[in-house]
UniProtKB/Swiss-Prot annotation:
One of its GO terms (molecular function) is NAD binding. This is D-erythrose-4-phosphate dehydrogenase. One of its GO terms (biological process) is pyridoxal phosphate biosynthetic process. It is an enzyme of class 1 (oxidoreductase). Pathway: Cofactor biosynthesis; pyridoxine 5'-phosphate biosynthesis; pyridoxine 5'-phosphate from D-erythrose 4-phosphate: step 1/5. It catalyses: D-erythrose 4-phosphate + NAD(+) + H2O = 4-phospho-D-erythronate + NADH + 2 H(+). NAD(+) binds at residues 11-12, 322. Substrate binds at residues 158-160, 204, 217-218, 240. The lineage of its organism: Bacteria, Pseudomonadati, Pseudomonadota, Gammaproteobacteria, Vibrionales. It comes from Vibrio campbellii (strain ATCC BAA-1116). Homotetramer. Gene3D superfamilies: Dihydrodipicolinate Reductase, domain 2 (3.30.360.10), NAD(P)-binding Rossmann-like Domain (3.40.50.720).
C-alpha cells in the first residue's frame, strides 16, 4: 500500500483525493493526511459537493483533526488534517509518508521538494511544472518508464502538457514532426476575477465570465522538456474562456510525410487502443466541452475536426478535463514512482 499525503487541498488536491476512490485505486493508495490552511468544515463541504464534478459518491464527515471517507455505515477511512504553512514542520516522518502529492501550485523547486524529504517523506510529486533542476518531469504514458529510484523530486507537468504531449508523440513516431503551433482554449481559473479587480496581469483584471482572455503560457517549454529535439520548434498561445472546466487544444503541425485525414485519425485510434490505452481517447461524436467533464483521459481527439492541408500541414482538436484527467495522472505517476523504487530494490 502506497501511503501519500496531499499538500494543498484546492481544485487539484480535492480531485486527487476523490480520484483515489472513484478510480478504485484506494486498494493501492492510502491517503494518510491533507495539509490545508482552510477550516475542516469547508474542506469537507467542498470535497462532498463540487460544481464541476457533482457530488462525491462517498459520504464525507469531519472533526477538527480528521476527514472521514465513509464506505458504509460502519467502515470509513480517517485522513489526518494539518494546517501548517511551513513544509519543514509537516509530520511526514511520523505518518510514514511515502510520497507527498504537492498540489499547492506554490512550491515547485528542488529545494521545496527536499524540504518535504527532510520532513520525512520518501519522495515528492508536484502537481504543476517545476523548476528545471527537478529530478524528472513525467507525462504519464510518454516517459514514465524513465523513472528511477533516485528520482525523489518529480513534477507531473501541467494539464495541457499531459493533453498535448501524448498526441505529439504519436504523430511524430508515425509521420515525423518538423514544427508546430498550439492554441490552448482553457476554462477560467481561480487566478481570475469574478468582477473587474486588480491583478499584476492587466488582462486578468477583467471579469472572467464576460470575456475571452489571452494569458501567457509556457507550454512550448514543457514540450521541449519532454522532447529536447523540439527546442525552438513549437510555439503556443493560450486564451481563457467563460466555462468552469474542460479545455480544448488546437494543434497544428508540419510533418515530413504526405498524409490524408484518415491516416492521421487511424494512427490516433490505434494508439488509443494499444500503447496509450486509458491515456488517449478518440471520438467522432458531435460533442461539446461539457461532454468531456469528468473524463479521466489525458487527451480526447475529435476526429471530425482533423484537417490536412497540402498533405503535410495537420490540424487537430484535442479535448481534456483539465482537472479530472490531470488528477488521475497524478495517481498513475505516484504509482510509477513507487514501482521504480521496488524494481531497483
Amino acid at each position: 500500500m502506497l501511503k501519500v499525503a496531499i499538500n494543498g487541498f484546492g481544485r487539484i488536491g480535492r480531485n486527487v483525493l476523490r480520484a483515489v476512490y472513484e478510480s478504485g485505486k484506494h486498494q493501492q493508495i492510502k491517503v494518510v493526511a491533507v495539509n490545508e490552511l482552510a477550516q475542516p468544515e469547508a474542506m469537507a463541504h467542498l470535497l462532498q459537493y463540487d460544481t464541476s464534478h457533482g457530488r462525491f459518491g462517498k459520504k464525507i464527515s469531519h472533526d477538527q483533526e480528521h476527514l472521514y471517507v465513509h464506505h458504509d455505515s460502519s467502515e470509513y477511512d480517517p485522513i489526518r488534517i494539518l494546517h501548517l504553512a511551513e513544509i519543514e514542520l509537516l509530520p511526514w516522518r511520523d505518518l510514514e509518508v511515502d510520497i507527498v502529492l504537492d498540489c499547492t501550485g506554490v512550491f515547485g523547486s528542488q529545494a521545496d521538494g527536499q524540504a518535504h524529504i527532510e520532513a520525512g517523506a520518501q519522495k515528492v510529486l508536484f502537481s504543476h511544472p517545476g523548476a528545471s533542476d527537478l529530478d524528472n518531469t513525467i507525462i504519464y504514458g510518454v516517459n514514465h518508464e524513465t523513472l528511477k529510484d533516485e528520482h525523489r523530486v518529480v513534477s507531473n507537468g501541467s494539464c495541457t502538457t499531459n493533453c498535448i504531449v501524448p498526441i505529439i508523440k504519436v504523430l511524430d513516431e508515425a509521420f515525423g514532426i518538423e514544427s508546430g503551433t498550439i492554441t490552448t482554449i482553457h476554462s477560467s481559473m481561480n487566478d481570475q476575477q469574478v468582477i473587474d479587480a486588480y491583478h499584476n496581469d492587466l488582462r486578468r483584471t477583467r471579469a472572467a465570465s464576460q470575456s475571452i482572455i489571452p494569458v501567457d503560457t509556457k507550454l512550448h517549454k514543457g514540450i521541449e522538456r519532454i522532447f529536447p529535439k523540439f527546442s525552438n520548434k513549437f510555439e503556443a498561445i493560450s486564451v481563457r474562456v467563460p466555462t468552469v472546466n474542460v479545455t480544448a487544444m488546437d494543434l497544428s503541425v508540419t510533418i515530413s510525410t504526405n498524409v490524408k485525414v484518415n491516416d492521421v485519425n487511424q494512427t490516433i485510434v490505434n494508439a488509443s487502443q494499444c500503447t496509450l490505452r486509458d491515456i488517449v481517447d478518440y471520438t467522432e461524436s458531435p460533442l461539446v466541452s461539457i461532454d468531456f467533464n469528468h473524463d479521466p483521459h489525458s487527451a480526447i481527439v475529435d476526429g471530425t475536426q482533423t484537417r490536412v492541408s497540402n498533405g503535410q500541414l495537420v490540424k487537430m482538436l484535442v479535448w481534456c478535463d483539465n482537472e479530472w484527467g490531470f488528477a488521475n495522472r497524478m495517481l498513475d505517476t505516484a504509482l510509477a514512482m513507487q514501482a521504480s523504487s521496488q524494481v531497483e530494490q
